[in-house]
């Protein structure tokens, strides 16, 4: 399985025209504690272990939208992003209105992503409406979590200005939730 992943990555780089140059490839992940960061580090470790001839340099980013922007500006050679944000970047809609990004190729779907709202076990928050007046992390700016949080709040009819919005990465959000400094956080 490990060799298969490395082979797929190697073929991907070859077929998409990604220039390896000195053998280092920057991959945009997301915040520490999230699945993108974990996946990118695992992949980087496999590439090193399997002696692929190149090394992946994992870059901590805000997440999906940031990765697409960094990919478009050639700061990174690979990036992990949610499918809905890839479509928005390509079409120039949503957070990418007026900033169409089309100089990338989608390589693979890694896994389906569900957006979750995390609260403490002793919380009285049971519905989205219960977030009103609460301190809630919607994720880092330019993250898929932030986009999903905004979509969920809009679709539920709860204006974002009725919650006390914070922009925290997953690790900080979990720590602040455990300490009682925020009431909930969105996790995609």
Regions found by a protein language model. Name each.
Residues 1-4, 8:
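Positively charged n-region of N-terminal signal peptides that target proteins for export
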Residues 23-50, 54, 113-179:
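Bilobed "Venus flytrap"/periplasmic-binding protein-like clamshell domains
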Residues 44-45, 59-98, 173-176:
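Pocket-flanking alpha-helical
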Residues 68, 76-80, 162-164, 168-188:
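Ligand-binding pocket segment of bilobal, Venus flytrap-like solute-binding proteins
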């Amino acid at each position: 399985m490990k060799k298969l992943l490395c082979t797929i990555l190697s073929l991907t780089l070859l077929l998409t025209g990604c220039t390896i140059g000195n053998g280092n490839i920057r991959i945009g992940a997301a915040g520490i504690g999230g699945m993108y960061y974990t996946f990118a580090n695992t992949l980087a470790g496999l590439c090193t272990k399997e002696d692929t001839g190149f090394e992946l340099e994992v870059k901590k980013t805000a997440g999906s939208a940031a990765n697409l922007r960094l990919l478009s500006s050639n700061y990174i050679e690979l990036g992990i992003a949610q499918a809905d944000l890839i479509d928005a970047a390509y079409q120039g809609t949503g957070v990418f209105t007026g900033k169409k990004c089309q100089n990338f190729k989608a390589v693979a779907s890694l896994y389906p992503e569900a957006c979750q709202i995390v609260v403490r076990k002793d919380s009285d928050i049971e519905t989205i409406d219960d977030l009103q007046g609460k301190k809630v992390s919607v994720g880092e700016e330019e993250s898929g979590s932030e986009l999903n949080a905004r979509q969920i709040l809009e679709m539920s009819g709860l204006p974002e200005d009725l919650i006390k919005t914070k922009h925290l990465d997953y690790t900080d959000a979990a720590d602040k939730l455990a300490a009682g400094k925020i009431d909930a956080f969105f996790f995609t």
